[in-house]
Regions:
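Canonical tetratricopeptide repeat
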Residues: 63-64, 70, 104, 138
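Bacterial Sec signal peptide processing site at the extreme N-terminus
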Residues: 16-37
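Terminal, low-structured helical/coil segments at or just beyond the last alpha-helical repeat
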Residues: 132-198
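TPR/TPR-like (Sel1-like) alpha-helical repeat modules
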Residues: 51, 107-134
Length: 198
């Protein structure tokens, strides 16, 4: 094989892989919009397509949130808890600091009956999300991160209940889901503000 043939094949593979990333990005963006609109089955389809195109695709570069994190969240929101656990564990391997993946992992584990592991992951993720929100609000006031305190209030309610030892699971699920979707909405709002500013 000639050097020019090898170069042509390499160039083609680079172009095709770039196209996969662009397609994955478009599918993740559409999936996020569907998820935030409550169209979880549609969101799941978009995230599945993105994961097939590029399972390592990072949608939110600042927070390093990958497609597997979004896919796992959509699996949880559509009741596919066992699949969600597998996908979210994979997302946590890709980014151990993905607090939303850890939150939904804990919610999925608890829904499957592994309440001890679920509670540990829910508590740890909520603690880190609260630290993150406090950091953002302290260092970037007026940027719109949880302006009415709804996310922080849900976290505080959940933390108080978990520390009491008297966990009402239906309330913890509701609080956890509200925190997860609230953070996702805030991320999308902030992302859009940054896009509009450029």
């Amino acid at each position: 094989m000639k050097a020019t043939d090898l170069l042509a094949m390499f160039s083609l593979s680079v172009v095709l892989s770039a196209c996969g990333g662009v397609q994955a990005g478009g599918n993740v963006q559409s999936g996020v919009q569907a998820m935030l609109a409550g169209n979880n089955q549609t969101a799941l389809s978009y995230f599945q397509a993105a994961a097939q195109q590029d399972p390592t695709y990072i949608y939110n570069a600042q927070l390093q949130l990958g497609v597997m994190s979004y896919l796992g969240r959509a699996q949880y929101l559509t009741g596919n808890y066992a699949q969600a656990v597998q996908t979210l564990e994979q997302a946590r391997v890709q980014n151990s600091g993905d607090n939303l993946a850890q939150l939904y992992l804990g919610l999925s584990q608890a829904r499957l009956g592994n309440q001890q592991a679920g509670l540990q992951n829910i508590a740890a993720s909520m603690k880190q999300i609260m630290v993150w929100l406090n950091f953002l609000n302290g260092n970037y006031p007026g940027q719109g991160w949880d302006p009415d305190g709804a996310i922080q209030s849900r976290i505080q309610n959940a933390q108080a209940m978990m520390s009491s030892g008297n966990v009402e699971w239906y309330r913890l699920f509701a609080d956890g889901e509200a925190v997860g979707l609230g953070v996702a909405q805030q991320e999308q709002t902030f992302r859009q503000l940054n896009i509009d500013a450029t």
